[in-house]
Regions:
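A bilobed periplasmic-binding-protein/Venus flytrap-type ligand-binding module shared by bacterial periplasmic
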Residues: 166-169, 326-339, 418
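Extracytoplasmic "Venus flytrap"/periplasmic binding protein-like
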Residues: 68, 72-139, 146, 170-181, ...
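Short, low-complexity disordered leader/linker segments with a strong preference
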Residues: 1-50, 71, 435-448
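Hinge/lid segment of periplasmic solute-binding proteins
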Residues: 111-163, 187, 202-206, 217-222, ...
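Short, well-ordered beta-strand elements
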Residues: 45-56, 76-81, 106-107, 205, ...
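Short, polar/charged alpha-helical segment
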Residues: 57-77, 411, 430
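Long, aromatic- and glycine/proline-rich binding clefts that accommodate carbohydrate-like moieties
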Residues: 38, 142-146, 307-313, 360-413, ...
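Glycine-centered hinge/linker elements that transmit conformational signals in sensory
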Residues: 190-192, 236-268, 310, 314
């Protein structure tokens, strides 16, 4: 019996070793070739750009946009990684990659509140030389300000968001009621119409919004507080108004008049998709969401209220003004990308007027570029953009600080507990949350 398992009959051990070494070299060359193919997309030699994005409401639109780009830029291949819909969960995914200086992220989307954090951490590439002031002026000023940190700009606006108010115009017409201007009018109108409709329609609620513990809750609650003359936090001055009477009373109103009253108790678990689904299924009279919800509300394949929906500014409290939280998404480049030139080529395309028009027409996303609000095709499909333009221009930002994730964590915990626990002392809880936020903001000032 052969003692050496690789012995070849009729040959000596020297020849056997030669065969083994040759075989191993061939295998190694094959592996090297395959690895090279992964890096350069096979023999085509394409530059691969890893694009990390959050889960959009209409994913097919982004696929179409990427396909157009790759057709017009055959030397570049886009590999898209789609994160979760929740901005909080997507933030966790993206920041973990950037902390690790991951090579599988070149271009990424940022929520409007992230640029200061990403800039301070050194994750986002400064774009001043690539995106100079003459180009910046083509975008809404609020979006440029949101992407600026210490005189450098770190993102290019993709689309703008602000909270808006949707209503069933057919039901308001039926009962000869106006669009509510105040939150109390909304609650009163909802109670009356739901009561009357219950005689024939037992599945109608008065209101639907986003009240789960996540970033969307902060957006919603800021709108109530601001529209009562209150404030959430001032990053520049390092103060929080959560403990002041206007803020406390606004939160109390939500707890006592919205949760489980005008809205079902289940809204405490709702993000945007769940709250919108209640509305488009014809089960909510009023609804707070972002501009994209208009397109879905009027899509016959997704909505039972097509042609029955109106849109307006959010209500406010008596004697105060309407406020809308600034939202929207930006496109940034990883400071660790090895293909920054190709990445910028993709960012330019993605934020162009041409692509923002596609996003407006096919996904209902409000453009960040000012000139598109005069586009006849967009206004024909979304006439309310003309009226809502002022809302987009004056939308109110959340506290602009690199430590915003810590601030948001305090806000989310406080708001969630405050609106879901009827027996807690709101004044005490609010004061405690305000003190926590001021300590966080003091840390930022101490680090400057």
């Amino acid at each position: 019996m052969n003692r050496f398992p690789f012995d070849v009959p009729g040959q000596g051990k020297k020849e056997n070793y030669t065969i083994i070494v040759t075989t191993l070299l061939c295998i190694a060359l094959m592996i090297a070739f395959l690895l090279a193919g992964c890096i350069k997309e096979g023999a085509s030699g394409k530059t691969v750009i890893h694009f990390v994005t959050w889960k959009p409401n209409i994913p097919g639109v982004m696929e179409e946009i990427i396909q157009i780009f790759e057709t017009e830029n055959p030397a570049i291949k886009i590999r898209r990684e789609t994160g979760p819909h929740s901005s909080t969960a997507f933030h966790d995914l993206l920041t973990q990659k950037l902390k690790n200086k991951s090579e599988d992220v070149d271009v990424f989307l940022m929520d409007v509140i992230w640029p200061p954090e990403f800039a301070a951490a050194g994750w986002a590439l400064p774009l001043n030389d690539l995106f100079p002031p003459p180009e910046q002026e083509k975008f809404m000023s609020s979006t440029i300000l949101a992407n600026t940190f210490k005189d450098n700009i770190y993102g290019v606006p993709l689309f703008i968001d602000s909270g808006v108010f949707y209503y069933r115009k057919d039901l308001l017409d039926k009962y000869q009621l106006p669009v509510p201007g105040t939150w109390q009018q909304m609650v009163d109108n909802a109670e009356w119409i739901v009561h009357e409709e219950s005689k024939t329609n037992g599945e109608l609620y008065g209101f639907s919004g986003q009240f789960k513990q996540y970033e969307g809750l902060v957006c919603n609650m800021q709108e109530y507080i601001l529209s009562n003359g209150g404030s959430v936090a001032d990053a520049e001055n390092g103060t929080s108004g959560l403990g002041d009477a206007p803020a406390v009373e606004a939160v109390r109103f939500v707890r006592e008049n919205i949760i489980g009253k005008a809205a079902p108790a289940g809204v405490l678990t709702y993000q945007e998709p769940e709250s919108l689904d209640l509305f488009v299924q014809g089960k909510a009279l009023f609804h707070r969401n972002w501009p994209y919800a208009w397109q879905i509300s009027n899509d016959p394949e997704k909505s039972k209220v097509v042609g029955k929906v109106g849109i307006a500014k959010l209500p406010h409290f008596k004697g105060q003004e309407s406020y809308s939280t600034l939202g929207g998404w930006q496109v940034g480049i990883s400071n660790y990308s090895k293909n920054k030139e190709a990445a910028w080529t993709f960012v330019q395309f993605l934020t162009s007027g041409r692509v923002q028009k596609i996003l407006a027409l096919k996904a209902g996303r409000a453009p960040a570029r000012k000139g598109l609000y005069e586009d006849a095709e967009i206004l024909a499909s979304y006439p309310h953009f003309r009226d809502m333009h002022e809302v987009f221009l004056t939308a109110y930002p959340r506290p602009g600080t690199p430590l915003y994730p810590a601030v948001s964590n305090v806000l989310q915990r406080y708001f969630s507990r405050a609106i879901s626990s009827p027996d807690i002392n709101l004044e005490k809880e609010a004061k405690g949350a305000a003190e926590e936020i001021e300590k966080i903001l003091a840390m930022e000032k101490g680090g400057k």
